[in-house]
Amino acid sequence: MKSSQNGWSPTSLAQHFDAPDGFRGEFGWVCGFSADASFMNDAAERFTRLTKGQRAQEGKVSIALYLDPSNPQIRLPDAPGVAHLPILDAARRPFRLLHAKVALLAFRHGNDHERWMLRLIVSTGNWTRQTLEDSLDVAWRIDIQSEALRGVDGIGEACADIRAAWDLFEWLGDRFDTRLLGADSRIGAPASREIVRTWVQACIRKARGTPRLFDNRKRPMFEEVKARLVAADRVVARNYLAMGSGFFEAAAKGEAMIPRRIVRDLISLKLLTQTSEVDLFVNPLACQSIAISVKGLLAATPAIVVRPAAMPEAAFPERRVRGLHAKFLFSANSRKGSNTCSSPWAYLGSGNLTDAGFLQAAGRFLGNLEAGVVIHPEGVEWRARRFVDSDRVITNLLPIQWEEDCAPQRSLESGADWSPPDSEFEAPPVSHFDWHEHPTGGELRAGSGDHM
C-alpha cells in the first residue's frame, strides 16, 4: 500500500512478518480461523528471508500454524517452513470455532546471536490472500528487543502481553498434534524453539500489570473489555462510540440486540454518556440482522446510526471496493472547537459482535475461541488537518466516516446465512516419518510419539 499523505504507508498484514534489519526469523507461532498457502508462503519468506525454494531445501519448520479444523491442510511443499498442525480431537475441542488471530514471532540478530526480538501481532483478519486483496481489516503489533529488558521503564505492559500470548499458544499446543515439531533437529527445529522459549521467559519475568491482550477461555470478550476499562482507572464517560463488525447475528433471529447491549452496559459503567453519539459500521452487502434493524436502532436511546464502513484513503488510495471484516469498538470524547480525541480507548480483535464471538466464553457449542486487545491510543485526532500526521487521524486508522449513513429506506442486504463448517483436518495416527541411514541404505520409521 502506498500513500502520499506525509509519506505514510500503512503496513499490510503480510508486511508484519518482515524481519527487522539485521535480523532473521528464528521461530514463530500463528493461530487463526483460516489461512492459505499463498499468504503463509509470503509470510514465511518475509520472516526467514529465504525463498520458497531455499526453505524447501533447508527442510526446517519455522512457523507452527494452529487453525480451525475446518481449514483444509496447508501442505509443507506448498508453504515450506510452515507446519499446519492438526487438532487432536475435533469432536471434543473446547471451542465452537478457533477464531482468535494471533502471531508470536521471534527473530535473532544475524551477527550478534545474543540479540533477539519478539513480535506480537493481533489481527482482525485471517491469514489469507483474501484479507490482503478484498477485506477491510486492522491489526495491532508490538516489538520487544532484548536490549529493552535491561532496565527500560514501561516495558512491563508489553512483557505482560507476551506472557498472555505465550499462555494461549501453550494451551493450544496441548490440543493440537505437535509431534512434527519434535522431529529431528533439521526438520522440527527443537533447538530454535528452546532458545525462543528462554527469550519468552526473560520477557515474562519483566511482565507487570494487566496485559492488553486477552482471550475468552475464561469469560466472554465483552466482559474482558469492560473489566479492562474499569481496572485501568480510566472510568470516564465518553460522548462518542463507534462499533464495527464483519458479521452480526443472523437475520432469522430477529432484530439485532447486541449493539444495544453494548451501549447499555457501557452507560451503566459510566463509560459512555446517555446522550452520546453512537455509530455502527457495517458491510451494506452483508450485514445479517442489521439489515432489518436500522429503524429500531435509530429509535434507541441513544440513537445508534448505521453507517457503511469507509475505506481509509491513506491505506487504500486505489479505492478498490472492500468488504468490512474488522471487529472494533472505539470511544472518545469530542469537544467543540477541538480536533483531539479525548480519553480514547479501542477494542480490536477477532470477536465479531455476535453471541458466539462477543458474549460467550469459549465452549464446544456456544463460544468461539477469540482474542483481542484493549488499548488507549495517545495523540489521536478526529479529522485530517494541516500539520496533523496521517497516522494520528482516526479515520485513517479505522474504517469509519461520518458523511454517509444507511437511512431506513436505504436497501441493505443481510447476505447469506453462515454455519460452522464440518471438520476436515484432524491428527492422523502417524504425523511424519524419519529417515534412518544404514551402511547398506536406510529405512523410514514412524516419528517419535507416533503410533501405527
What kind of feature is each model-predicted range?
Residues 1-452:
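PLD/PLD-like phosphodiesterase catalytic module centered on the HKD motif
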